[in-house]
C-alpha cells in the first residue's frame, strides 16, 4: 500500500536520534510501544523500543503488533513496508484479521507462504526475535497446513550435528516439541543470553538439552553458566563425547578436560567423528591413544587419519594452557589457537 504523508513523516521522525526531553513528540505521533519510544533504522529495517534493544525486523515487528492487536502499529508498519501477509501468522481476533484484509492481506496463507514466513522470521538470531518466534509458532494451527517433513527438514538442517550423533532429537517428537528444542538450541548456539534465560526459567525439563547444545556448539560461556552456576549435571565422559561431536570445539573440550574427563577417550571420539583439529588438540593435551585409534580407523574411508596416527612425531604441547575453567580465560587462550602437533604434522608432510 502507498504510505500517507503522515506515515512518511513518522518514518523520518522515528529515524532521528531525539534527546529524551523530546520523546514527547514521538508519543504525540503514536511512535510509542511498551511505554517507550519507537525508533526505526531505515537501512537495516529494524524497529527498536523498550525490551527490543537488539531490534526486530520490520516484518517481525508487524507480527508482534498483530499478536498484541495493536491496530495503530499494524497500520504504521504496513505503510512503512512490512508485508501484511506476515501478520496472518499471529492474528488471533476476527477484528485484527479484518484489519489485515483491509490492508491488503490474502484471505488465507497457503503451505508455501507459511513455510517461507517461517524461514524468513527465524533468520535473525537475536534474543527478541527467537523468543517471539517461539511464542508465535508454538501451537500455531497454521502449521498444520505445512507438510510435516518440510518443517522437520528446516529444523534438522541447523541442528544436524546433534541429530546425527545423539538420540536427544529425532522424528518421534511432536513438531511442537521439535520447535521448542530448536529455538532453545539456536539461543545457545548464538549465545543469546536473554533467550537462554527465558527458556531455562520456563522449561526446566530441558536442562540437559541446554547443556548438550552448549557442549556441541562450543559455547563455553553457557556451558560454565549451566554446569557451575545452574548445577545442571551430566556424566563427565558423556559431556566430553558431546563436546567432540563437532570439529573445532576446542573450548568445550578443554573445559571438560579441566573437569577431569579422559583426554584419550576424547581423542578416540574425535577420530570416530573424523574431527581432525580436535584430534590434534587432544594430542597437545597429552592424548596418546594411537594404537586404539589405528584399530578404530581400520575400516575404509579413514585414510587421512590413518596417515596422521601412523607417524611417531607427536608430543604434548610444551607451553601448557592455564589450568582453569573460567570461560573468559579459556576463550582468550583458544580463540586463535593453532595446534603444535598439527604444525609438526604439516611441516613433516612437506619434507
Curated annotation (Swiss-Prot):
Entry superkingdom: Viruses
Keywords in alphabetical order: ANK repeat
Keyword Isomerase assigned: no
InterPro entries linked: ASFV_MGF360
Database matches in Pfam families: ASFV_360 (PF01671)
Chain positions of ANK repeats: 57-89
BP-aspect Gene Ontology terms: taxis
Family stated for the protein in its record: Belongs to the asfivirus MGF 360 family.
Function: Plays a role in virus cell tropism, and may be required for efficient virus replication in macrophages.
Protein name: Protein MGF 360-12L
Amino acid at each position: 500500500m502507498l504510505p500517507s504523508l503522515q506515515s512518511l513523516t513518522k518514518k523520518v521522525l522515528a529515524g532521528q536520534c531525539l534527546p529524551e526531553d523530546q520523546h514527547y513528540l514521538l508519543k504525540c505521533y503514536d511512535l510509542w510501544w511498551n511505554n517507550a519510544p519507537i525508533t526505526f533504522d531505515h537501512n537495516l529495517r529494524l524497529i527498536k523500543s523498550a525490551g527490543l534493544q537488539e531490534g526486530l525486523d520490520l516484518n517481525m515487528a508487524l507480527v508482534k503488533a498483530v499478536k498484541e492487536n495493536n491496530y495503530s502499529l499494524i497500520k504504521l508498519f504496513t505503510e512503512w513496508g512490512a508485508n501484511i501477509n506476515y501478520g496472518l501468522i499471529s492474528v488471533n481476533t476476527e477484528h485484527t484479521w479484518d484489519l489485515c484484509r483491509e490492508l491488503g492481506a490474502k484471505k488465507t496463507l497457503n503451505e508455501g507462504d507459511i513455510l517461507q514466513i517461517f524461514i524468513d522470521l527465524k533468520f535473525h538470531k537475536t534474543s527478541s526475535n527467537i523468543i517471539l518466534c517461539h511464542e508465535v509458532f508454538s501451537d500455531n494451527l497454521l502449521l498444520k497446513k505445512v507438510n510435516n517433513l518440510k518443517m522437520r527438514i528446516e529444523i534438522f538442517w541447523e541442528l544436524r550435528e546433534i541429530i546425527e550423533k545423539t538420540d536427544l532429537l529425532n522424528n518421534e517428537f511432536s513438531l511442537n516439541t521439535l520447535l521448542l528444542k530448536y529455538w532453545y538450541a539456536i539461543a545457545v548456539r548464538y549465545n543469546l543470553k536473554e533467550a537462554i534465560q527465558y527458556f531455562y526459567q520456563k522449561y526446566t525439563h530441558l536442562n540437559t538439552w541446554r547443556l548438550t547444545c552448549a557442549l556441541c556448539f562450543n559455547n563455553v560461556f553457557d556451558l560454565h553458566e549451566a554446569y557451575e552456576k545452574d548445577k545442571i549435571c551430566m556424566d563427565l565422559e558423556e559431556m566430553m563425547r558431546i563436546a567432540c561431536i563437532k570439529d573445532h570445539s576446542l573450548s568445550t573440550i578443554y573445559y571438560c578436560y579441566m573437569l577431569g574427563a579422559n583426554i584419550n577417550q576424547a581423542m578416540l571420539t574425535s577420530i570416530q567423528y573424523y574431527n581432525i583439529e580436535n584430534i590434534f588438540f587432544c594430542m597437545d593435551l597429552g592424548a596418546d591413544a594411537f594404537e586404539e585409534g589405528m584399530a578404530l580407523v581400520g575400516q575404509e574411508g579413514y585414510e587421512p587419519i590413518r596417515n596422521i596416527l601412523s607417524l611417531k612425531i607427536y608430543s604434548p604441547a610444551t607451553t601448557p594452557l592455564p589450568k582453569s575453567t573460567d570461560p573468559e580465560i579459556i576463550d582468550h587462550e583458544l580463540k586463535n589457537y593453532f595446534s603444535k602437533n598439527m604444525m609438526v604434522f604439516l611441516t613433516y608432510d612437506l619434507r
